[in-house]
Amino acid sequence: MALLMEHQFRQLPADKQVETRPFLEAVSHLPPFFDCLGSAVFSPIKADIAGNITKIKAVYDSNPTRFKTLQQILEAEKEMHGAEWPKVGATLALMWLKRGLRFIQVLLQSLVDGDKDDNNPNLIKVNVTKAYEMALKKYHGWIVQKLFQAALYAAPYRSDFLRALSKGREVKDEECLDKVRQFLVNFTATNDAIYEMYTKMNADLDYKV
């Protein structure tokens, strides 16, 4: 699990405020996760995540003191953009980023939970399907949904996927999954806090692409 464990997310403080700089540092290492899935069809999610990180970073870099937390960014943009908010700026970028992170979160949690197709236990199609349906499907139009259905048939074997997460090293599946569990603790808490923030601030949008 070296790919993810080398760049852990921070434990959240009691008030669940997500600090912008360490968050951006941690998420910047996540796009290569999609290379582990093997299919180029997943590259749009990878590109979307990378692009949204860049947009959020640009806003943060413009005033690191003012934008110390993600909530401070949303609050400032709400005041700045008025009726255009939340359809603009880092607020919109983070909205889509959290969905990409939820895809990763659900996929990894599904593997840890042992979800599998009893007829094909070494395929991760079940896990990828669950992640897509829970995180992204409702925001995709018919054409994009069909593209991802095609990608499912190119999903790698479970053993190959875990090996890719371990950067090609031969490690036991259970050893890799133990590290996935460790990674998920702060990663899940962080993304859940972002979802909660969007709900409280009424900043989520449900349009399709």
Curated annotation (Swiss-Prot):
GO terms for biological process: ceramide transport; intermembrane lipid transfer. Residues 45-66 are annotated as: 2 X 12 AA approximate tandem repeats. Beta-D-galactosyl-(1->4)-beta-D-glucosyl-(1<->1)-N-[(9Z)-octadecenoyl]-sphing-4-enine binds at residues 48-55, 140, 207. It is found in: Cytoplasm. GO terms for cellular component: cytosol. Pfam families: GLTP. Keywords: Cytoplasm, Lipid transport, Repeat, Transport. Sequence repeats lie at residues 45-55, 56-66. InterPro entries: GLTP_sf, Glycolipid_transfer_prot_dom. The keyword Repeat applies. GO terms for molecular function: ceramide 1-phosphate binding; ceramide 1-phosphate transfer activity. Its main location: cytoplasm. The keyword Cytoplasm applies. Accelerates the intermembrane transfer of various glycolipids. Catalyzes the transfer of various glycosphingolipids between membranes but does not catalyze the transfer of phospholipids. May be involved in the intracellular translocation of glucosylceramides. Belongs to the GLTP family. PANTHER family: GLYCOLIPID TRANSFER PROTEIN, GLYCOLIPID TRANSFER PROTEIN-RELATED. This is Glycolipid transfer protein. It comes from Danio rerio. The lineage of its organism: Eukaryota, Metazoa, Chordata, Craniata, Vertebrata.
